[in-house]
Amino acid sequence: MSWLRSSPLRQSLTRTTSSGNGIRPIDAATDCDPRACYDSFCKHWQQAYDIIQHSSAPAPTHDDVLGVVSHLDYMVTLLLVELHNCNKISLADSNAPPTAPCLEYLLSENLLDKLYEWAATTGRYANAVRLEQLKLYELLVSHSRHQLLCHEPFLRPLLKILASSQGEIFPPDLEKRLVILLNQLCVVLMQNVHLLDLFFFSAQTQVQEQIQNGNVPPPKSGTTTNFIIFSLLIPYVHREGSIGHQARDALLLCMALSQKNSNIGTYIAQYSSICPLLVTGLGGLYSRLPNSIEINSIDWHRITPDDVTEIPELNLFMNALEFCNAVVQVAHEMIKQQLLDFMYQGFIVPVLGPAILQTNIDSQISAMSYLDLILRSITEPGLLRAFVKFLLDTEKFDGERILDALVERLNSPDGNLCMVTMALFDTLLGLHCEDLMLELMLKYMLPGKHVPISHRHKINKIDPYLNSTEFFLELTPDVMKRARDLARPKSVNEHQQESALPNELSLPSLPSPVMSKTIGANWNYYGLHTGDSLYANLQAYLFEAHWRIAQCQRDCLKWANSYRYQKWPRQGQPQNRLHNHALELAKQFFIEFGGEGIGGLGGGAAIASEAGEKQLDSLQSIGESSGYESFKWRPADEDVSASSGNGTGSVVVGDHPGHDVTISESDVDGHNISSSLSNSSGRRESWRISHNTRNELLLTDLDFSEDLFAQGTVSLGPFLNAIWGKLQTFTSNSLYVNLHLTGLITRLAWYPLPLIHSLLLRSDIVITSDTPSFHQVLRILKQQIDAELPVTEDSLEIIDVARSSLIDREFRLVNARKGNENSPLHQQQSLQHPHHLQPLPAPQQTGAGAQQRSAYATLSAATPVQATPFSAYDPFKRSNNSRRSISKSITSMFSRKSTLPAPAIAPTPASSGLSQIYAFFTGAASTIMGNNNQQSSNQTHLNSSSSSAVTTCETSLSTQPHATGPGSAQLRTTSSTISTSSGTTAGSGGGGGSGSNSSFSIGGSTQTLSAHSNNTTNSSSTLHGGLDGIGPPTGSFNSEPVSLDSVGSSMGIIANTSGTERSRDLALCAVLLDEWLKELAAIAQEQSIVLVTDQWL
């Protein structure tokens, strides 16, 4: 078929498609004589028809086929000119239909039918002639839209060529033209639904006629009905490239047509194989995904959209998943239900289930990352409902629930697995699904045993929320309060007031704010010096909390149950005996524990009972101080409005007629709660709504004898226990684990449920459980940070660097060119542009006792070091290596060489310029210089002059990428001496990690240097870094490029020399805890507003 490449029709169509929109570029000013065009059209057809009649013998020759194709090319050109003129005429005068003599001749003489019959006899040239026919139909359909479909001389040969294409295997170019034509036909049918029956016919009528007249084979599906366009598109649903995209778009149009025509929906659901094909293809594409992910970034926790785009296997899988999501969204109800059933039984359970339950950690990380990506990608409630059922199913995996397995992985010692798990739970909590929240938290909290009896009446109160705001702000570590005071400008009166304070109340003696480096030029606090950062901006936290809480409240209002502290009578047991028993227990409680509410048991303790089914709890007469309320669900089959003295508003559980019935199942057993599972057929609910209705409750949660003696053993459930366990190790976790941990708890605090608030936001409510409460853990963290990080100048310097690094991290995240620089594409760009190198993680330490690397062991080679927070307007920012710092010049001016043994100095070296001058006069500087002059002569990179012998790290030290090979310097700071020695470290060249069939690389990977632990006794910190080959060698270090975050960070060099590694980690924890407490305070304040509004409504 090489001869066809030079045919006139191919060349003309090539020019047509090259114009951009697939239409031949015809000059609007062209004036053609309609009569001349018609005569030329008739002449070309007569010549082509003569060739057809002449070549009808055994088979046409090469010249015969070429001649017919040439004449067809001229005929198509004349038709396009005529249609173009007709469109201009129709715009000018839309009342009178324009005449099209060429098109009328084409239809009246049955030219297309004769052409099809001749093409069937072309033998080996059949595909070439079919290709030209498809191009002809494509051009006519695109220009005439639905007008030609109404004419039988055009429709009959079109149906014949489509029917003959079923079950055939065509070359790629012919497949492309076929899919394009089918796509155009779907667009036309979507706009003209009344023409749909032309392509949807039964085998007894139109198909049989076509078979008899046109020798067309019957459809291979063997069905009595056939939607021929849909049948031809099915084989291309999983095809790659533009063919697959166009086929899926056309199939979606057919699915949308099924909503308008029930016959189409019935045919697709009952007679086509689209649903099994979609599910099996999705499972096959999932099996091609890498079984393990090679992680090259220390903070990687989920797959980004860039990763999906740049990994071919993942891109194909996500295309198929998004197509299934779209089908469920637009298809007929029968198709939707069938696809959901196939998805659950054929993909979610047999494919995702075993993948998630694997025992290998790498496989678990990859499977959970894929699940997280799936949950973040799908939007259709039906699919989300299926995944919720999958997480809670207890029958498919030998009694083990997927949700329980995920909760156990929160306690994993592997940092990557822990972060991926927390990211997955962040996605799950963001679904605002009632069943998930019930299984994770609410079913353990509903009995109310985690709250003492005397505190249960406080749960629905609103006033204490404001006290909780002050409580969170008071938990700020002392060093952060001092740093905040130094950053805030003080008036003369404030200085006088401070000087008037007693000595025992004054803070430790520190330099004035003017002399301290810890004052950030852009550090914002309550709107002061805001700059561009949102750190310490309480207004930003309030706005975020308001928006998040409002969004969560809108979703929770659709739940089937209101999880509030309510009163409700016991059912099925004698009321008098229950009331008497409760009153006796109440009297014993107040007598034994000296409660203040005993006075309420006098005249006001009469038991009130009402006739009818709706009775109020008799314990209501005890009063608010008794605390004998219990957590109750209101029945879903009736509307109940109950009011009490503790501020509980009325709750009405009504129907949700606009939502689907949920298919998830979750039982609430144990904890003295019995619930009956029932599916209400008369109510259609959202996927977020649980179908559990609590109409029959045992009042055993009022068994105060159990409460009084067993409150200390109440469990909050494995999920909260795992979260609290991680929070207790806050100061030893990595920065990124803490970021995910605080984000997860913050998302829980967004829920407008007083039950959850009693754990997180209410500091006035005592929690009695088998683990320390949330507020107790926060107090312990504050005490630990205050004890290990006292308010000293060195601590404030480290705090300043930690704060600067987090602000710089924020700016880099905001200003990143792409949504996430964790992608493999960013790897390649980083390799191509070394001046944008990002810090990377060093090889992980082996052994059971290996500890996580400190985030302060990193330094960005792209950004100069700053002691103050990053600012584009910082006038003291210097990135030029030729400029030397003032502190270095002063130090070299007063320096003197000494070879005497150095006396012992403080464990933490002075870091500021003025402190170095002071250290010089006290002998510390000479000690450092003396140790430096004892180095060997081959360490030329460290000693170039007498002034460069000072190796104390200064705040103005600059960092640059490596320029002279693997040379490095190791600085060991011990408790008695500071010695500097040069050496070489085994630096491993970076790479993106080669992908394979079982793994692929995610995260920036450009350069890695080995990080070795310091084995020297009494060692407090170790720094590995390559010397800067440009500029003065003194004080120019590159620290170990361990990744601080996915987009890089600028950590001050002072963080590697001032204080121990533990103090630097504590500084990061202090800054993060300070910001998190502000966020929790903002959430508590906004939740009080939400509750007040809810009561008034």
Swiss-Prot record:
Residues 986-995 have a biased composition (Gly residues). Residues 1-25, 639-684, 820-856, 932-1042 are annotated as: Disordered. Residues 641-654, 824-852, 932-948, 973-985, 996-1006, 1013-1022 have a biased composition (Low complexity). Keywords: Phosphoprotein. Pfam families: DUF5917, KELAA, RAI16-like. PANTHER family: FHIP FAMILY PROTEIN CG3558, RAI16 PROTEIN-RELATED. Belongs to the FHIP family. This is FHIP family protein GK23746. It comes from Drosophila willistoni.
